[in-house]
Amino acid sequence: MAESETVLVTGGTGFIGSYVAEDLVEAGHDVVAYDLSTDDRILEKLGVADDVEVVRGDITDPTSVFRAVTESGATRIVHLAALLTTLARDNPRSAVEVNVMGTNNVFEAARSLDQVQRVAWASSAAVYAPPANYDGDWVDEEDLVYPDTLYGATKEYNEHQAKVYFEDHDVSHVGLRPTVAYGPYRETGGSAFLANIVEKPALGESFAVEYGDQVIDWQYVRDIAQAFRKAAFAPEEDLSQRIYNVRGEVATIREAAETVARIVPDADIEVSDEGELPWTQMLDMTDAQEDLGYDPEFGLETGFREYIDVLRAEEGLEPLQ
């Protein structure tokens, strides 16, 4: 294991941020969660609220970011704070301020403060063009980047500014391109149906879902957390590049529904093949496996089982064997 270090996690009280904090704590590191929200509900549910220092701050305020990095003594930053797809679309100016200038504040802090050895940060599979551009093939980091959302555009810009900070200012960084994370305590959003396909049957509710024959990357949140830790600590000499695809298990919506039905025998899920999803899901993650040692631990069934048991426990229901 790497020696214990202090890691600042921006967006650290959010869904993915809380799991990243938990993962880092379990790996023996000191964690500071930097976020506009000091609601540690998810950290509490994960059992690490007492082990994580929560610092309230605004990622768009450079003074606030510098102060948090300096006062925490952080040697690594995991930068997750962002406005996601739907919020970005509805609040375009804020999306640019948070996603682009907020990221710039993080890179500026890393450039100015010698203590910071690495910034691991969230890009997104949203930087890729819509799926029709790839002829159903696996997509790797060399393929066409042409986002059709503002969110994706901010992430693409961040890949460019990260490159500049690395080449011109020697700021060590690793950016990851995850798709959509699923797991307990996810906030609802544009991909809420991905949560409902598990959550509703787990609690005995019926659910109807479209897109049955379309492929989704089912990426369990604990695997994404593992990926960010490895991105933060991978030795420089192991990195063949700076931006990596990461994914979980690729399966159709119908296959996911069938998996839920195996776990929850009385699940009432109706699946149709209507509609078309606008995301590129088939990410080749060979480079992340080779360079970062990224190795997803949760397949569809194991991820769904843990997710369902947590949901049922929350509702006072028995776990499913």
Question: Which residues are covered by each model-predicted region?
Answer:
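NAD(P)-dependent short-chain dehydrogenase/reductase
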Residues: 13, 163-216, 221-225
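Rossmann-fold cofactor-recognition segment
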Residues: 48-60
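Conserved glycine-rich Rossmann-like NAD(P)H-binding loop of the short-chain dehydrogenase/reductase
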Residues: 29-40
